[in-house]
């Protein structure tokens, strides 16, 4: 049976995903090492995105994975700020709002559990779908880098936005391990 690291490693061989995530390809050993370091790093938070119907059908967590979403907590001097990322790696899962739902759930988790007050997303300039999604979530463009070919978007957490987030995620299901 394939491991989570092996599946992720396979995804990250895609030049498209490397471009969209600004990632370099890793060896399988490096992938295992990175996943172990993330597991023990208190400044990183990852949710694995599982396609619910596939999981119900197969009972296979790894085979049901379609992507992930991450929070990178900023250094201690700015502990109420985090960078958010989203990746729907499985092509067949794109365009089904999984990224939307997973991002909203991660934002809620960041607000409710971690006390995050400001979120930031760094997105490739040509990733129009992600820029549009974060705009619809109330993020605003704060900078653009032609050198890094990315736009930085931010959202300050306020009561109105937090209420909107909670309304958007009503009925969503988080599976805790």
Features from the language model and the residues they span:
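Conserved GNAT acetyl-CoA-binding A-motif
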Residues: 81, 110-124
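Conserved active-site alpha-helix within GNAT-family acetyltransferase domains
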Residues: 100, 114, 125-143
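Conserved acetyl-CoA pyrophosphate-binding loop and the N-cap/start of the following alpha-helix
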Residues: 93, 97-106
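GNAT-family acyltransferases
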Residues: 1-93, 113, 140-177
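Active-site acidic-Proline motif in GNAT/NAT acetyltransferases
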Residues: 90-96, 125-126
């Amino acid at each position: 049976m394939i491991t989570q690291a092996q599946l992720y490693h396979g995804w990250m061989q895609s030049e498209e995903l490397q471009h969209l995530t600004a990632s370099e390809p890793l060896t399988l050993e490096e992938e295992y090492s990175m996943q172990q370091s993330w597991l023990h790093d208190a400044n990183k938070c990852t949710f694995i995105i599982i396609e619910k119907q596939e999981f119900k059908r197969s009972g296979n967590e790894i085979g049901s994975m379609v992507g992930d979403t991450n929070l990178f907590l900023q250094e201690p001097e700015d502990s109420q700020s985090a960078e958010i990322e989203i990746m729907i790696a499985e092509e067949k899962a794109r365009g089904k709002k999984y990224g939307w739902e997973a991002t909203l759930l991660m934002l809620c988790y960041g607000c409710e559990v971690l006390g995050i007050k400001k979120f930031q997303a760094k997105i490739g300039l040509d990733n129009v779908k992600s820029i549009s999604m974060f705009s619809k979530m109330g993020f605003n463009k704060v900078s653009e880098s032609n050198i890094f070919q990315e736009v930085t978007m931010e959202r300050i957490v306020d009561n109105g936005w937090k209420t909107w987030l909670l309304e958007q995620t009503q009925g969503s299901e988080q599976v805790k391990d």
